[in-house]
Amino acid sequence: MVSYEKVRRSLRTATITIIVLNSLSLVFRLFTGISVQLAKTEINKGNTGNLPKEHIEAVLSATTPFMLFVTALIVLVNIAIVIFCIKNLRAIKRNQMVNYLPYYLGFAITVGLVILGFLTTKAPWAIAINIVFQAIFGLLYFHAYQKAQKLNERDLEVTN
């Protein structure tokens, strides 16, 4: 027999972890975006100092309209995941049905970031690091999704 209290605690822990990691990711992306924009402004002014050509190209490619759109989309998805996970924490506390949406969004952004990494990253080591980080996120979302599914199935059985 499954201990639903353990499932509930496990889901709560996973959801809190998702909130923390997505919040950190959000802050990191915002600071990175600001830094890259400031670097681009300096490059456009001609203040390249002794930066290698590869670094200048990396800054310029990170500030294309497409990459700015992708960054904004990722920030919005991170915000949505955090908001829905906070709502799920309330649902867990009140023994209500848990929403799968933050976990679906997490899966989608994980797959999207792996694909984006292959399309935009030239260094094999950077691609490998991206895959490892996204695999960790993917496993966390999958774990939380499974626990949410177990709790929701139990809640459906109880109400029927």
Question: Which stretches of residues belong to each language-model region?
Answer:
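Loop-to-transmembrane helix junctions at the membrane interface
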Residues: 69, 74-114
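Physicochemical signature of membrane-embedded alpha-helices that form the seven-helix bundle of GPCRs
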Residues: 14-24, 66-73, 77, 102-106, ...
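Cytosolic juxtamembrane helix and N-cap/initiation of the first transmembrane helix
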Residues: 1-39, 61-65, 159-160
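Alpha-helical transmembrane segments of multipass membrane proteins
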Residues: 25-28, 32, 77, 81, ...
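Perimembrane loop-to-helix junctions flanking transmembrane segments
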Residues: 38-63
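Membrane-interfacial loop-to-transmembrane-helix junctions in polytopic alpha-helical membrane proteins
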Residues: 3-17, 55-69, 91, 95-98, ...
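Alpha-helical membrane-associated segments of multi-pass integral membrane proteins
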Residues: 105-147
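Cytosolic juxtamembrane helix at the C-terminal end of the final transmembrane segment
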Residues: 82-101, 136-160
